Amino acid sequence: MAAEGKAIAKVNDLVIFVPYVVPGDVVDLQIKRKKNKYAEAEAVKFHELSPVRAVPFCQHYGVCGGCKWQVLPYSEQIRYKQKQVEDNLRRIGKIELPEISPILGSAKTEFYRNKLEFTFSNKRWLTNDEVRQDVKYDQMNAVGFHIPGAFDKVLAIEKCWLQDDISNRIRNAVRDYAYEHDYSFINLRTQEGMLRNMIIRTSSTGELMVIVICKITEDHEMELFKQLLQFIADSFPEITSLLYIINNKCNDTINDLDVHVFKGKDHMFEEMEGLRFKVGPKSFYQTNSDQAYNLYKIAREFAGLTGKELVYDLYTGTGTIANFVSRQARQVIGIEYVPEAIEDAKVNAEINEIKNALFYAGDMKDMLTQEFINQHGRPDVIITDPPRAGMHQDVVDVILFAEPKRIVYVSCNPATQARDLQLLDGKYKVKAVQPVDMFPHTHHVENVVLLELR
């Protein structure tokens, strides 16, 4: 399996990437795109199924863009993810490595996400079976997920296996009410229509947040919208935060928009080892809560804290890792690009009465400078959790200048992590590697690496 989650075939030395098949399948392929060194294809006929192939559990498999590895047993999924980490570190990093620990699989492989976002659209995607029936469908509104490669089309979802089933019940109830009362769904090309998006968040504390996003251009639409919200509140009393956002823009981003409370609170909490983390409608929080806890425990263990260390937490987000390790450190300094996330980090520190954590907002390469190090002190430990693109060269250079005793590198992209490890290799030796599976049935994998100063 390739890093993108596709299977690999070879024909006359041409490498071909094929989605929705597994090693051992015997298929006829149709080339869809050909480059100099590789091609992309789709399977048009199966002659023989692989002995390791599993039966997909989701009725939307193969059309929905998510959970593409359902056709692999979970034991095979994590085996390929382990290999993906090992291949990237060795092929790209080209550095000396210790024995790589077996991947930490997810105890939950279904209903493991704490957040899903659904899209409304008046352009329902018709499946191949529906198209072949050659029937004119009266109901072309849909609520579900975008179809890959067709931004204005949405696949109507009946059941999603990623989030607790309350999510399915809420989505389907809202859909049916909107159908029955003739609510307009957004046209993603013309931007006409009322209902846009719905975000559902659950938490380890049992709280439930629903955010409904709509476009309102006339007064009577607001009254209709509030009737829908009242229906949701009456139908699902377990909702602790029912919020709404008016989005009259031409895109779905909500970070610059006001959030209104229809019922309950404007936030909920996640808990971890007695720490409480405030999660708002716009907050970032790892979407697999159980595995996030395991990931943070690994990072803390690798950091080897004794209570005397100054720790820098780079790309701190809402400060979850920083606050999580603060009780074992002398001081923690978190840096993050998004100002709103830093405000959340400060609030979380205050909620948990953490006095030894400082947070700064700004672009990492501009914030983490030699002057910053000289002003705040050389860190004993750096924990870094960058985005998929990895760390900027300037950030790597300042880390090398700071010379912390240990670096804990948390990554959602082992390829860019391997590149960065090679840049650090002159001064640092990799001492431990621990892959973690945060997203079962996808090709994505997290990896935690401990480096020590040579």
Please describe what each predicted stretch is.
Residues 200, 206-215, 276-280:
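Short, aliphatic-rich beta-strand segments
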Residues 7-12, 144-147, 211-213, 345:
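Short, acidic/hydrophobic/Gly-rich beta-strand patch recurrent on exposed beta strands
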Residues 101-108, 188, 195-197, 435-438:
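Short, solvent-exposed loop/turn elements at beta->coil junctions and helix N-caps
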Residues 24, 163, 288:
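Short, conserved phosphate/pyrophosphate- and ester-handling motifs at nucleotide-, phospho-/glycolipid
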Residues 45-55, 62-184, 218:
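Extended interfacial segments that mediate partner engagement and assembly in macromolecular machines
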Residues 1-60, 358, 365-366:
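Terminal RNA-binding accessory module
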